[in-house]
């Protein structure tokens, strides 16, 4: 895992619903915790692009549903600023299910993957067809 160069807006708090962008069998995920989050009292933990979160599978195959799994956020609707000054935003909030070490469980990723997530997680960048 590599550090992020951009200022990522943490726009996906606990309870946020994400699209599962891989072929593991999950369709919709709900954020239940953000790994390594140190926040203030009474503030909801939130994550952004490139962060590892723990999710609960809300929709998908019967084997996948109701499981708590680690995932990496690869897209977010809220725009964020890159180091060169450009602003980036995507059509949806999406994540891919991974192992605790960060290697994806699926064999393909649907849709674009943010450059920040691809740089930080080499396993995700290997499966990404489009890096934006």
Swiss-Prot record:
One of its GO terms (biological process) is translation. Signal peptide: none annotated. GO terms for molecular function: large ribosomal subunit rRNA binding; structural constituent of ribosome. Pfam families: Ribosomal_L14. InterPro entries: Ribosomal_uL14, Ribosomal_uL14_arc, Ribosomal_uL14_CS, Ribosomal_uL14_sf. Keywords: Ribonucleoprotein, Ribosomal protein, RNA-binding, rRNA-binding. It comes from the Archaea. One of its GO terms (cellular component) is cytosolic large ribosomal subunit. Binds to 23S rRNA. Forms part of two intersubunit bridges in the 70S ribosome. Belongs to the universal ribosomal protein uL14 family. PANTHER family: 50S/60S RIBOSOMAL PROTEIN L14/L23, LARGE RIBOSOMAL SUBUNIT PROTEIN UL14. Part of the 50S ribosomal subunit. Forms a cluster with proteins L3 and L24e, part of which may contact the 16S rRNA in 2 intersubunit bridges. This is Large ribosomal subunit protein uL14. It comes from Methanococcus maripaludis (strain C6 / ATCC BAA-1332). The lineage of its organism: Archaea, Methanobacteriati, Methanobacteriota, Methanomada group, Methanococci. The gene is rpl14.
């Amino acid at each position: 895992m590599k550090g992020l160069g951009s200022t990522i807006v943490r726009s996906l708090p606990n309870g946020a619903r994400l699209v599962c962008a891989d072929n593991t069998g999950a369709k919709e995920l709900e954020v239940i915790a953000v790994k390594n989050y140190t926040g203030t009292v009474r503030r909801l933990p939130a994550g952004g692009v490139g962060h590892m979160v723990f999710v609960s599978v809300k929709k998908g195959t019967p084997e996948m549903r109701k499981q708590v799994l680690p995932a990496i956020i690869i897209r977010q609707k809220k725009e964020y600023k890159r180091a060169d000054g450009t602003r980036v935003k995507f059509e949806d909030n999406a994540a891919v299910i991974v192992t605790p070490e960060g290697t994806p469980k699926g064999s393909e990723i649907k849709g674009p993957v943010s450059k920040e997530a691809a740089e930080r997680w080499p396993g995700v960048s290997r499966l990404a067809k489009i890096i934006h």
